[in-house]
């Protein structure tokens, strides 16, 4: 039996490598792009409005006593967590490219955080807000031509991010309870503007995004979002509120998560067993 020398010298890529190799999808039709544009406007209107408005107020010193909330729950950090997934979904779908593996889990985690927080933290209009978040997200997911399959999304516990996720849950749980109490009992301007609800919302989102990264390798980039937001909350509290042990711990935890996520991103490879790299 003879063997073709050229074929024997050329390695055949494994199924795992082929699955992880980006490939173009069919270009979206005009109708699909109209659906993407309309759903994109709806899903990004609030995070961009609140996020950019809060950023301008923060930079110009408008309402200086609200600077911490402008940075965190009222606008900037919450807006980033809210918009990151939808922006990635829209850009990839518009270009006819596969959506990044982290984009849909990041958006779904934020939507879940919205619904969970609104279910037990009081505040004027918070349940309507959560419904808007969920409905606009569903419209976007309907418009996206090829969402990642749920099968295989959970592929084991990450040995580094899993303990960090548990620590994050233990760190943020009492903070969420405290913010709920403030929203329910205070009658100051912060309570009227539901800032305490916003902070609970942000905290729940950070934890859920970190848990998502801990159980799904393809969604690992959500840990960068969670770590960056946690670091922002901690440092922002130390600089704009007053130094407390909790803010120190939040900054340290967020920095650890961010560092671990970035390091894993740089060293990630396709595992021989068929695991996926973070995308």
Residue ranges and their predicted role:
Residues 1-39, 266-279:
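Actinobacteria-biased recognition of intrinsically disordered, low-complexity terminal regions
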Residues 20-29, 74-83, 106-113, 147-150, ...:
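Hydrophobic alpha-helical transmembrane segments
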Residues 34-40, 92-109, 160-163, 219-228:
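Membrane-interfacial loop-to-transmembrane alpha-helix junctions, especially the N-terminal start
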Residues 38-50, 106-118, 131-145, 156-181, ...:
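Alpha-helical transmembrane segments of multi-pass integral membrane proteins
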Residues 49-79, 114-130, 174-201, 235-253:
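Membrane interfacial helix motifs at helix-loop boundaries and amphipathic/re-entrant anchors
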Residues 81-99, 139-146, 206-215:
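Canonical alpha-helical transmembrane segments
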Residues 137-159, 256-276:
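Membrane-water interface at the C-terminal end of transmembrane alpha helices
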Residues 201-279:
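C-terminal transmembrane-bundle signature of multipass membrane proteins
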């Amino acid at each position: 039996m003879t063997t073709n020398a050229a074929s024997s010298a050329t390695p055949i890529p494994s199924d795992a490598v082929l699955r992880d190799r980006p490939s173009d999808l069919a270009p979206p039709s005009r109708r699909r792009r109209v659906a993407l544009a309309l759903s994109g406007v709806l899903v990004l209107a609030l995070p961009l409005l609140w996020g950019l408005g809060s950023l301008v107020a923060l930079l110009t010193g408008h309402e200086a006593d609200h600077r911490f909330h402008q940075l965190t729950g009222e606008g900037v950090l919450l807006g980033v967590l809210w918009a990151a997934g939808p922006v990635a979904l829209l850009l990839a779908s518009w270009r006819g490219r596969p959506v990044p593996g982290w984009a849909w889990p990041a958006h779904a985690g934020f939507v879940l955080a919205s619904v969970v927080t609104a279910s037990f933290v009081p505040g004027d209009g918070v349940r309507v807000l959560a419904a808007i978040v969920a409905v606009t997200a569903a419209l976007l997911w309907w418009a996206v031509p090829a969402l990642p399959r749920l099968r295989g999304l959970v592929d084991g516990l990450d040995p580094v991010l899993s303990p960090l996720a548990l620590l994050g849950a233990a760190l943020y749980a009492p903070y969420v309870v405290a913010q709920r109490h403030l929203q329910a009992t205070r009658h100051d301007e912060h309570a009227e503007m539901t800032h305490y609800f916003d902070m609970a919302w942000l905290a729940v989102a950070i934890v859920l995004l970190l848990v998502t990264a801990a159980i799904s390798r393809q969604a690992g980039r959500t840990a960068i979002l969670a770590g960056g937001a946690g670091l922002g909350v901690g440092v922002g509290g130390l600089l704009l509120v007053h130094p407390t042990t909790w803010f120190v711990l939040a900054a340290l935890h967020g920095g650890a998560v961010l560092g671990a996520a970035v390091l894993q991103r740089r060293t990630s490879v396709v595992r021989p067993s068929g695991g996926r790299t973070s995308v």
